[in-house]
Amino acid sequence: DVLGSRGLGDVYKRQPADVYPLSTFADIKAYCASRHMRLWQYAEECEGTEIWDYLKEVWRCMREAVTRGLETEGTLKGGLDVQRKAKMLYRQNHIDESAETRENRLVCAYAYAVSEENAAGGIIVTAPTCGSCGVLPSVLLYMQERRGFTDTEILHALAAGGIIGNLIKTNASISGAECGCQAEIGSACSMAAAALAELHGMELDQIEYAAEVAMEHHLGLTCDPVRGLVQIPCIERNAVAAMRAINALSLANFLTYTRKISFDVVVNTMYETCLLYTSPSPRDPK
């Protein structure tokens, strides 16, 4: 069934395959709480222990994308004359740089690195898409370097972030062409915030709050790449979303039990916003 059509083509009602037996965060949270499980344990229970070999490869590819991006200079192809900025950003440290400024600079440099690799046709991990591939690896690598988290802890965080991404894909969309950039960068930010919360050993309610905040403040964001290339504003948008994921983590740490909105509600709202975005406008030519 065609739900609507606007600029980027027809939008069809999706019927995604089930990955996990439970399809809402509320149900997963209740299931995990009743069994004293972490989200990564739920992923392992559903997918088997082989998930860890897969995620090891995912993490290796993510790290390598950051490394390549930080080492490469030049102009991205496509005609927009976009200069690669990750290396410059990474090296622009100052003697009087504050800890907060350094964190922002490094996280952004890592996000730029991966996003520029994507724009250049390099190997990246869709997390959840190519256009939003810089958010998750940038925050996880920064936290590993800063806090000394083990690779095993990173893999657990990736599993938690993957559950969030799957829930968004199941109940809404991760496609920018279908639902705007709220579905790409919003989903990536939500996955990253949840992964960070898992990495820091937060409770399920706190993980949910981090994911909810991260998605909520991307609602309505449009897919608007200049000349259709995943460069402007896409690369910069990855860096901004990475910082926002860290902000969502901080809020979840302090304000979880004051929240009024669930993650599931925000995901549904995102898809409702998508339908408004793709519905014919009264001003559209007949």
What are these regions (language model features)?
Residues 125-132, 176-188, 234-238:
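Active-site nucleophile and cofactor-binding loops and adjacent substrate-binding regions
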Residues 194-279, 283:
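Functionally critical mobile loop/hinge segments
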Residues 5-6, 10-94:
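C-terminal regulatory domains involved in ligand/effector binding and gene-expression control
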Residues 17-20, 31, 46-54, 58, ...:
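Catalytic cores of large soluble enzymes that bind and process phosphate-bearing ligands
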Residues 109-113, 134-144, 159-167, 182-198, ...:
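Contiguous, well-ordered alpha-helical segments that form the cores/surfaces of helical PPI scaffolds
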Residues 61-130, 134-143, 147, 153-166, ...:
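Accessory "access/gating" subregions that flank catalytic or transport cores
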Residues 1-12, 277-286:
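Single conserved hydrophobic/aromatic residue that forms the stacking wall/gate
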Residues 146-152, 199-204:
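Secondary-structure transition/capping motifs at alpha-helix termini
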